Amino acid sequence: MMQSADRAAGRSTGRTGSLGGTGITDRICLVIPYYEAGDDLVVSLTSVRMRRTDLIIVVDDGSQQRPARNLIPPTVADTPVRLIELEKNSGITMALRTGISSAPGDFAFIARLDCGDTCHPERFSTQRDFLSRHPDIVLVGSWVDFVSPDGSFLYRLEQPVDPTAVRKRMRVNCAITHPAAIFRREAYDHAGGYPTAYPAAEDYALFAQMLKHGDAANIPQSLVRCRTGDGGISDKKRRTQLVSRCRILLKHFDGHPMAVYGLLRAIGQMATPRRWSTWAHRIRVKLTGQ
């Protein structure tokens, strides 16, 4: 699996030379946004295995009933945890921007995780090593196992591995699963950070912009388990998300046939009930693995 990821990165288009070679440390800052998530935060933190020189930042987005301060330990497996508390609920985009802006300047990599999602023990060492060996890659994700609220396995999302395939998929939808992403801090800054103009699709908007500064890849191994089906953002704000996706596709539209398909597909999904799209997606995953 890892060899195929390395071969894929070796075929990257090399659109950046400096972003991977700044000489700063290879430390990771993991940013976890939190809002009234309770024990889901504990579940996520318990799964994290990083170096003691790394950092975990939890951003409490104005919780009143279940503030994160009552839940987080000072360290997780020797990795320090820092809490940032926002005075009022401002949304995930602002929480992420605040968390990342608070990361020490000499941390090369920013990682993401959502409350309730969990990591494979080797996630961070695998992705750190991959980015360290491939300076042209500014963003790396992995395959992801989706589970039900009770933890039952639903399906594995096998995102494209090759940087060329990632770019092709980005013309249709986001090719990097957000909670599995790790990216270079410098590329994030060059892209302008998480934009506020694309609600429910801030990850897609950021990653599409980051591809102007380098390549992206996915490690062909399931390194994250994501919980779904319990009222997450894709369920509550599906139409908002689809509108944002259309706007992102239009912003980066290049006339490629896949770009045309992606835009028409997003428009069609706005007229399709969520349960139909979910059913079709699961069938596609079973047939293609993607």
Predicted segment positions?
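Conserved donor NDP-sugar-binding/catalytic core segment of glycosyltransferases
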Residues: 122-154
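Glycine-rich, basic loop-to-helix element that forms the pyrophosphate-binding segment
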Residues: 86-104, 126
